[in-house]
Amino acid sequence: MKKLLALVLALVMSMSLVTISNAAYSDKADIDLKEAVDVLSAVGVFEGSDGKFDPKANLTREQAAKLVAYLQLGQKSADALVGGNKFTDVAANRWSAGYVDYCATTGVVAGIGNGQFNPTGSLTALQFGKMLLVCLGYDADSEGLTGADWQINTSKLMTSAKLLKGLDSVKATEVITREQAAQMMLNALKAPTVEYDTKGSTITINGAVIGIGGSKATYVTATVAEDSTVKNIGKTQLTNSNEYTVELGEKLFSNLKLNSTADAFMRPATKWTLKAETIGTYADTPDLTYTAGTKIGTIYSDLGLSDGISKKNVTEYVDGVYAGAFAYDIVKGSKDKVGGNGVLLNVYYDDDAETITFVEVNTYIGKVTAAYPDTTT
């Protein structure tokens, strides 16, 4: 019975979101990171091959160069690029020559040494992250994304930009698949862009590239009144300012919009549109999931919180209905409980807004209130 109820609940939840995908790949059933693949396909960055996306295949270095060129220039301009002058193992007639040379010229890639690029080699999350950071505006030399300490410096900026969000099981040093690359690119679209007043110069000491004389990277900003596209994907307001960060997706795709919504159970969801056409609506992944009554203190610990959250910043829904003002602050060691047996509890934590949403779904058919002895008639 429990298995049956779980299957029914899963079916109902999946039907609560209607997704119109632009990525009509024949192997779409194999795609786990559907939101990322759909959005990046809709804007023309991914196109697949022979009608397939091949989500589990490792991303190669030359494929990554093509993705970045498509992202920054658009397909038509990127396909018009010519190359073959930067690396000895990327001939002018190789399909990826234009993309590779473009990325090398703009500082997105630097090769593997000895004048080579290794175009068919695989790519780690850290290496692809460095490419995306340059797309966001970070200067590779100024930020130390080259040289002996490039991995440490790249990892720090990737964490700040949340480039691995949704890829909790992926280590930065691991080779990434095509769908994982799509997820990283989706995260980049939602990350703020940066700029420099001056970039300065660099010196190399014991293999470490050190930037000198340059200014620090600052967020590219705009006011809502000056740039309405700032509301399309992100709207992070700077402290004590009327300025808002401009995310990469807003910079590159003015018709791409991201709106927060919810499904029938009031689970937070994301709706993407392009030129007013819906790409899809996707339920957010909960930060925590429980199937029994859970102490507030446990949730506090499992979220890794260091400060409490006021009950005023907590919202609770039960079977899609607002449950009223939440009764408890989210504090360390609290023994107050939320959820219960037979209740699926999803916890959504917004670390930027410092809010928590509890979504509870009753998975039982009925509740036994009394038991009677068996009788015969």
Task: Give residue spans per PLM region.
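Extracytoplasmic, non-cytosolic globular domains
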Residues: 184-187
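Feature responds to low-complexity, polar/acidic, surface-exposed segments characteristic
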Residues: 1-34, 43-97, 106-126, 133-175, ...
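Solvent-exposed hydroxyl-ligand-binding patches built from regularly spaced Ser/Thr
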Residues: 229-377
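Extracellular interaction modules
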Residues: 95-96, 174-178, 339-340, 352
